């Protein structure tokens, strides 16, 4: 993606967003050997650095498929945080073994746009398989999840796929959610790298 859409990548960076790594060709890291994972990680980081000038500080594995070795390799290549696991509600330092840790910024399926909008089997298989969700229901879910995280001092991570949320009818969901979050007044909209700085990785 970085090499094919370098101008768009630079525009995203210019607008103040962080560029993190996500494999090279959307590889399932869990199915690769350690050597293959290392080659993918290296190629991904080099592609981003070549275009953006700086290496990425964060990594999210395509579809969340990874192994502990994936995180070790990411750390080896200078990655400072991961945002892959669904095992906590606050950032924490993932034990990589041998005294090594990596900041994990956990995600949750309820805050991911893909399951709501990308799956639509016809006929329904298995029986009762959900259809693409209604927009108002998704917005309500995301607001409720945010409210709960804010109420208990947790970390709300919204995971978005540009091809999913970027559809003309869906982008307004994100705008409405951001407006709602901003209205709360005491919310920190942080990049992963800012969280890494805060936690002192």
Q: Where are the model-predicted features located?
A:
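Catalytic alpha-helical scaffold of carbohydrate-active enzymes acting on polysaccharides/glycoconjugates
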Residues: 1-58, 63-112, 136-158, 166-201
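Glycine-rich, positively charged active-site loop/lid region within alpha/beta enzyme cores that binds
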Residues: 103-128
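Surface-exposed cleft-lining segments at the edges of enzyme active sites
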Residues: 55-56, 121-135, 162-163
């Amino acid at each position: 993606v970085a090499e094919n859409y370098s101008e768009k990548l630079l525009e995203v960076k210019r607008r103040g967003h962080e560029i993190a790594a996500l494999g090279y060709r959307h590889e399932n890291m869990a199915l690769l050997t350690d050597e293959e994972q290392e080659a993918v990680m290296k190629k991904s980081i080099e592609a981003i650095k070549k275009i953006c000038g700086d290496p990425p500080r964060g990594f999210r594995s395509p579809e969340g498929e990874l192994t502990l070795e994936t995180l070790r390799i990411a750390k080896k290549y200078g990655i400072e945080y991961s945002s892959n696991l669904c095992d906590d509600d606050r950032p924490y330092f993932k034990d990589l073994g041998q005294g090594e840790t990596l900041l994990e910024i956990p995600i949750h399926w309820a805050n991911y746009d893909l399951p709501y909008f990308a799956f639509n089997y016809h006929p329904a298989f298995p029986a009762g398989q959900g259809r693409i969700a209604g927009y108002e229901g998704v917005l309500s879910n995301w607001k409720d999840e945010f409210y709960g995280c804010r109420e208990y001092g947790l970390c709300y991570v919204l995971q978005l796929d540009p091809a999913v949320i970027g559809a003309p009818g869906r982008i307004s969901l994100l705008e409405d959610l951001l407006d709602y979050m901003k209205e709360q007044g005491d919310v920190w909209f942080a990049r992963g790298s800012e969280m890494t700085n805060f936690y002192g990785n």
